[in-house]
From Swiss-Prot:
One of its GO terms (biological process) is GPI anchor biosynthetic process. This is GPI mannosyltransferase 2. The chain crosses the membrane at residues 6-26, 86-106, 128-148, 167-187, 201-221, 257-277, 286-306, 334-354. Signal peptide: none annotated. PANTHER family: GPI MANNOSYLTRANSFERASE 2 (PTHR12468:SF2). One of its GO terms (cellular component) is mannosyltransferase complex. Pathway: Glycolipid biosynthesis; glycosylphosphatidylinositol-anchor biosynthesis. It is found in: Endoplasmic reticulum membrane. Belongs to the PIGV family. It comes from Yarrowia lipolytica (strain CLIB 122 / E 150). It is a multi-pass membrane protein.
Length: 357
């Protein structure tokens, strides 16, 4: 109970601090949020960047092709809230609450993996202090995606593969990289085959298939809407609208981000990338986790907008295990100081509509 109380106090303090900073940052040059909420300063300062797309799409569903870069399911779910203001408040509330629940689920997952209650509690606390900062407040999908990820991984850890697959499959409705959670099932299947565990193998196949099936549905849905009338990506060998709009509208692709003007973004990402690199482990029982960890890190460096690593890494328990290990060490206070300085800098830049975002 004492640890839970500590988590709640730190959680509320961090959220209040980030929101207060966002409200006092000098007004950004982009007016999208002001046009959406001309008479609501709170929402006009928090619903910016990607949140603008989520709220707009929630009001009228996905209308334009480029909006499919943002979760269709998240927008549809938010749309149930009704009015524009209600949608925005709901997004912020769900994002914030999911952050807390994700920390609690990460604690359960960590204790299940390491059988160390104190380490699990430290991991949960580090997750509350996450470098993702304002992105776990402002109505993005990261918090809920992380909650589903940790829940699914916990169920997998307990051998409940079909249920784990259903939960991790649901994460694919929020973010395409949820497909990567199918990788641990491949390791589990190999283990089941090696040890002649037929029933376990069948259970693993069902769970992994659910992840793949939901991901394929997220690709089929826009294809059924736009194709075959929309040439171009409809005729690709793998007709994925997400990959197409990311490449066309956001210039995502191999080494496309490696330009001189993006050097600051690489510097923004460097601390988290360094922590991810240092945290790598060859412990056989952890290899499935670290395989996903490594793929996401490499994809961010070579394929995606590298600065997003600070927020999309929130689904990686491996990163927070390492941060918890550092926090329990002799110089653990340096980790906490780094996070506090970083999230302060981050929210000021984000609120002024400047990278990293």
């Amino acid at each position: 109970m004492k640890h839970f109380t500590t988590l709640i106090v730190v959680f509320v303090a961090i959220k209040a601090y980030l929101v207060a900073l966002a409200l006092v940052v000098p007004r950004q040059y982009d007016t999208s949020s002001t046009l959406l909420f001309p008479n609501n300063r709170f929402l006009s300062r928090l619903v910016i960047w990607d949140s603008v797309f989520f709220v707009s799409s929630a009001e009228r569903s996905h209308l334009y092709e480029h909006e499919w870069a943002f979760s269709w399911m998240w927008s549809r779910a938010l749309g149930l809230a009704g009015s524009r203001d209600a949608i925005a408040y709901t997004a912020i509330a769900v994002s914030s609450l999911s952050h807390l629940l994700a920390a609690l689920m990460l604690r359960k997952l960590t204790e299940s993996v390491f059988h160390n209650k104190r380490f699990a509690e430290t991991t949960a606390l580090m997750y509350i202090l996450s470098p993702a900062g304002i992105f776990l407040v402002a109505g993005y999908t990261e918090s809920l995606f992380a909650l589903l990820s940790f829940t699914g991984l916990y169920l997998r850890q307990r051998g409940q593969y079909p249920l784990a697959g259903a939960v991790l499959g649901a994460s694919c409705l929020l973010r395409g990289n949820g497909l990567l959670w199918g990788i641990p099932f491949l390791f589990d299947l190999a283990s089941a085959i090696k040890h002649n565990q037929f029933n376990r193998g069948v259970s693993v196949v069902i769970g992994g298939s659910l992840v793949g099936a939901v991901f394929l549905y997220t690709q089929y849905l826009p294809w059924s809407i736009f194709c075959p009338e929309r040439d171009e990506w409809c005729n690709y060998y793998i007709p994925s609208i997400y990959g197409y709009v990311q490449q066309r509208y956001w210039n995502v692709g191999f080494l496309r981000y490696w330009t001189a003007n993006n050097i600051p973004n690489f510097l923004f990402a460097a601390p988290v990338l360094y922590l991810m690199y240092q945290s790598m482990s060859t412990n056989p029982s952890l290899v499935p986790f670290y395989t996903v960890h490594a793929i996401m890190g490499l994809a961010c460096v070579f394929m995606w907008h590298v600065q997003i690593i600070t927020r999309i890494s929130t689904c990686l328990p491996t990163l927070y295990w390492y941060m918890a290990k550092l926090a329990q060490g002799y110089n653990g206070h340096y980790v906490v100081r780094y996070i506090f300085v970083w999230i302060t800098f981050q929210v000021v830049m984000w609120g002024a509509y400047l990278p990293p975002a």
